UniProtKB/Swiss-Prot annotation:
PANTHER family on file: 50S/60S RIBOSOMAL PROTEIN L16, LARGE RIBOSOMAL SUBUNIT PROTEIN UL16M
Molecular function, one GO term: structural constituent of ribosome
UniProt-listed Pfam families: Ribosomal_L16
Entry-linked InterPro entries: Ribosomal_uL16, Ribosomal_uL16_bact-type, Ribosomal_uL16_CS, Ribosomal_uL16_dom, Ribosomal_uL16_sf
GO CC list: cytosolic large ribosomal subunit
Gene3D superfamilies tied to this protein: Ribosomal protein L10e/L16
Protein name from the UniProt record: Large ribosomal subunit protein uL16
Gene: rplP
Amino acid sequence: MLMPKRVKYRKTQRGRMKGNAGRGTSVAFGSFGLKAIEPAWITSRQIEAARVAMNRYMKRDGKIWIRIFPDKPVSKKAAETRMGSGKGSPEFWVAVVKPGRIMFEADGVPMEVATEAFRLAAKKLPIKTRFIVRPDYEA
């Protein structure tokens, strides 16, 4: 699963997801992309599940790029713990995704295969997504 090797601070504040994505909004590496339509925290487990679903369908043909990285720790208190006594320990990692962000890219496969692979990947994610094709793509 994806997570940073080391971080400057172990715990972060929650923050809020205002507005649209400023960068990472166009297909850069492959010919096809999966774009986020709504904001969300995507966990490293969800990213991995989507990646596995795409790889299984594409049968290791072509190449997949993951354009998001879970760099935000989410802390959680232990079960049946009284309130107070500090913030909980980091439990899992999330990637903050805003609308318009390209999350996954693929290349080296026909459009029909890429469309189905991204559809399967989108089922593993907690947000609405859209299939994007590079403007200069020719079959």
